[in-house]
From Swiss-Prot:
Protein name: Cdc42-interacting protein 4
Compositional bias of kind Basic residues: 314-329
Phylogenetic classification of the source organism: Eukaryota, Metazoa, Chordata, Craniata, Vertebrata
Amino acid composition bias (Basic and acidic residues), ranges on this chain: 407-420
Source species: Pongo abelii
Domain SH3, first and last residues per copy: 540-601
Gene: TRIP10
Subunit-structure text: Homodimerizes, the dimers can polymerize end-to-end to form filamentous structures. Interacts with AKAP9, ARHGAP17, DAAM1, DIAPH1, DIAPH2, DNM1, FASLG/FASL, GAPVD1, LYN, microtubules, PDE6G, SRC and WAS/WASP. Interacts with the ligand binding domain of the thyroid receptor (TR) in the presence of thyroid hormone. May interact with CTNNB1 and HD/HTT. Interacts specifically with GTP-bound CDC42 and RHOQ. Interacts with DNM2 and WASL.
Length: 601
């Protein structure tokens, strides 16, 4: 069944139907285009979301990246990013294979439809013109027949009229004959026109228009087939990415199963274990018998041997609670000469410094200045720690681990250089045996450089081994002190003996005398040691930065800067949003990190 046979008289219906089919094709293309925009926006939002939650710092600089929870989260973000890439691929396939191709095909269909309907309308116009000619010849034949009949009646009436002349009768007969001849010609022309029209009409309805309708039917069926294929492309584009999306989902599942709480707990220990010994028991201080002190007892506390008692900074400071807030350390109160504050008693004895040897006084000043400078340095270290090569700024356990890492890295580099030296030696032997392969002298600079690197790395390995051994011994001693301290039962805080103050003083003196003197105190003269303590520790910039915005720096600890000003970076942001910088004309302070463009050395 075809349109040319069954719908031979439904030209307008076919015109509307084919137009509806093309409109449907355009609507589907528009739908897919909007679907593509949705996919692209979805993928863009997913990528923005992933970028928002990805860690800003590199994994090697981020301690949190060592936890399995963080690693799984980063892996999930990467899988989501891959998923977004698949959504972009779906959008691209739909845009190219559906939107572009169907739009081009729709334009071709519209041109073909226009051509077929123009051909049909042209055939209709030709048939209408033939019908008009048939009507004209028919009306002419009808008019000529009436006039011929009228002329024949006139000639017959004159022929019967006795008053009519012979000339009038002859004229009427000639007129009747002429009209009869004209009617006969009109009849023949009408018959020929009718025959021609019937032939054209039969050709129009049985051949010409059915062919046009069949072409329209074929065009519409091809359009429907292509549209159905376009419907299938919508699902095929999804099915093509299903395996990769399934891998993304499987990766998310693997990341979820990779969370290891026990390992994270161990990682936290590895990252933050200090290696310090636990604090010992707080000693009981008896203030109930202040009058039993010796008259010569002062802030320096002269023991029985006549030497002034000097308490170290660790004994005079408030006990540090490890779980409390980290307050800034304050320097111990000092007298104008650098010693402890004299006794507050108005009638107290004079200071034992009077009549002392000046060298002894200078020695006491040097020893008392050390805690003060140490407290100032610890105060500055609370704002920005100076990193040392032996990692002595870290707690013992962390120092040991960092030294172990550095030692392993240097050992690997040393082994690499040794292997390279062996390879160069073999290559040199080959060149010496077969000179056409190369000049042995050309390898001498590389061999020399390799030997220099080996010597340098050996020295570094020895240096780190010594530091590591010292750090390990320190960790072991801290562990031993902690165990022995906890094994000793605490002293009862009740019923102290009357001479507890003198006992504690003598005990402190005994403990201080049992401590081995350092190499610095043995070899360095007192005046040199005193001068070195007052020297400012140099701090070199770790980078430079440029001020993006103007900052007033009105609050305490901050510094003002102008927009575009070049500054030296002294300390990175510790997570509080502030960075310590130094101006070229002098002066250091903190400025907002978001106001800077930072470049590390």
């Amino acid at each position: 069944m075809d349109w040319g046979t069954e719908l031979w008289d439904q030209f307008e219906v076919l015109e509307r139907h084919t137009q509806w089919g093309l409109d449907l094709l355009d609507r589907y293309v528009k739908f897919v285009k909007e679907r593509t925009e949705v996919e692209q926006a979805y993928a863009k939002q997913l990528r923005s979301l992933v970028k928002k939650y990805l860690p800003k710092r590199p994994a090697k600089d981020d301690p949190e990246s060592k936890f399995s929870q963080q690693q799984s989260f980063v892996q999930i973000l990467q899988e989501v990013n891959d998923f977004a890439g698949q959504r972009e691929l779906v959008a691209e396939n739909l845009s190219v294979r559906v939107c572009l191709e169907l739009t081009k095909y729709s334009q071709e269909m519209k041109q073909e439809r226009k051509m077929h309907f123009q051909e049909g309308r042209r055939a209709q116009q030709q048939l209408e013109n033939g019908f008009k000619q048939l009507e004209n010849s028919k009306r002419k034949f009808e008019r000529d027949c009436r006039e011929a009949e009228k002329a024949a009646q006139t000639a017959e009436r004159l022929d019967q009229d006795i008053n009519a002349t012979k000339a009038d009768v002859e004229k009427a007969k000639q007129q009747a004959h002429l009209r009869s001849h004209m009617a006969e010609e009109s009849k023949n022309e009408y018959a020929a026109q009718l025959q021609r029209f019937n032939r054209d009409q039969a050709h129009f309805y049985f051949s010409q228009m059915p062919q046009i309708f069949d072409k329209l039917q074929d065009m519409d069926e091809r359009r429907a087939t292509r549209l159905g294929a376009g419907y299938g492309l919508l699902s095929e584009a999804e099915l093509e990415v299903v395996p990769i999306i399934a891998k993304c989902l499987e990766g998310m599942k693997v990341a979820a199963n990779a969370v290891d709480p026990k390992n994270d707990s161990q990682v936290l220990i590895e990252l933050h274990k200090s290696g310090f010994a636990r604090p010992g028991d707080v000693e009981f201080e008896d203030f109930s018998q202040p009058m039993n002190r010796a008259p010569s007892d002062s802030s320096l506390g002269t023991p029985s041997d006549g030497r002034p008692e000097l308490r170290g900074p660790g004994r005079s400071r408030t006990k540090r609670w490890p779980f409390g807030k980290k307050n800034k350390p304050r320097p111990p109160p000092l007298s104008p000469l650098g010693g402890p504050v004299p006794s507050a008693l108005p009638n107290g004895p004079p200071s034992p410094r009077s009549g002392r040897d000046p060298l002894a006084i200078l020695s006491e000043i040097s020893k008392s200045v050390k805690p003060r400078l140490a407290s100032f340095r610890s105060l500055r270290g609370s704002r920005g720690t100076v990193v040392t090569e032996d990692f002595s700024h870290l707690p013992p356990e962390q120092q040991r681990k960092r030294l172990q890492q550095q030692l392993e890295e240097r050992s690997r580099e040393l082994q690499k250089e040794v292997d390279q030296r062996e390879a160069l030696k073999k290559m040199k032997d080959v060149y010496e045996k077969t000179p056409q392969m190369g000049d042995p002298a050309s390898l001498e600079p590389q061999i020399t450089e390799t030997l220099s690197n080996i010597e340098r790395l050996k020295l570094e390995v020895q240096k780190y081994e010594a530091w590591l051994a010292e750090a390990e011994s320190r960790v072991l001693s801290n562990r031993g002190d902690s165990l022995s301290r906890h094994a000793r039962p605490p002293d009862p805080p009740t019923s102290a003996p009357p001479d507890s103050s003198s006992n504690s003083a003598s005990q402190d003196t005994k403990e201080s005398s049992e401590e081995p003197p350092s190499e610095e105190s043995q070899d360095t003269p007192i005046y040199t040691e005193f001068d070195e303590d007052f020297e400012e520790e140099p701090t070199s910039p770790i980078g430079h930065c440029v001020a993006i915005y103007h900052f007033e720096g009105s609050s305490e600890g901050t510094i003002s800067m102008a927009e575009g000003e070049d500054l030296s970076l002294m300390e990175e942001d510790k997570g509080d949003g502030w960075t310590r910088v130094r101006r070229k004309e002098g002066g250091e302070g903190y400025v907002p990190t978001s106001y800077l463009r930072v470049t590390l050395n």
